[in-house]
């Protein structure tokens, strides 16, 4: 199956008073039709900046995409005209943002905010857009959908606001849905409801999903493949079951080791990754994880490893074979 989206060698920088921040450094990934790709990592690793760069949503200044490609349907999203990218954003590639509390306009009704993209991208009349908006709210599980179109965001709970955001993202039947930590501000019960809702809609509508999160528990039950980011780089990528069963990068091992397990003794201390994430004012020449890594060897401090395929579909950027206990050649 051909790739629906291919991102290659993406680099994004931010110019600040303190210096140049290298936020995304040569990130590459692909997405197939109907596939769910999870992008995981600590806060500040470049997850959100990667997809915002791809959709040209990085504020400029201070941000700038300095290299790379994002090929969708034969077009490079980074090079097409402003008008062309506007026709794709929201219609073909849609996005759910992190915080449902602030992502909706507080002075416009929910109906107005749902109807505008339908009239803009789908060419609907106001009556048609109103009917479609009510259908969308019903589809995401909001009762009394037509009546609630007249309500304002503050009249909805956090979970219901996130459902509205999902309805808005799905309004134009996108091929790709990008979910940027959509459950971060919600309690665990509502998180589970939102994840199940997205899974159901994915299966019904056949769309591809990029799900960005720091929560490996959510990704386990949602994604087909996982890319792990650290310091602006993808450092491991694998099918989800393979990654959880056989993590090969010390950072991935640390992330998985920090998860609480229901089958273990409740008195066990959770493991943690010592140290702090890298400061990105300088693009690292060595492995960015080396200062925090208990497996590090001499090459780790001299050269940044590239992603290499170690088994079908499983790529890792590490100088050490952590399972074999030896240095990679």
Regions found by a protein language model. Name each.
Residues 3, 143-147, 237-329:
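Short catalytic/signature loops enriched in Gly
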Residues 151-156, 160:
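Conserved ABC ATPase signature
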Residues 42, 178, 182, 186-268:
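P-loop NTP-binding/switch modules centered on Walker-like glycine-rich loops
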Residues 51, 55, 71, 101, ...:
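Short helical segment in ABC ATPase nucleotide-binding domains corresponding to the A-loop/adjacent helical element
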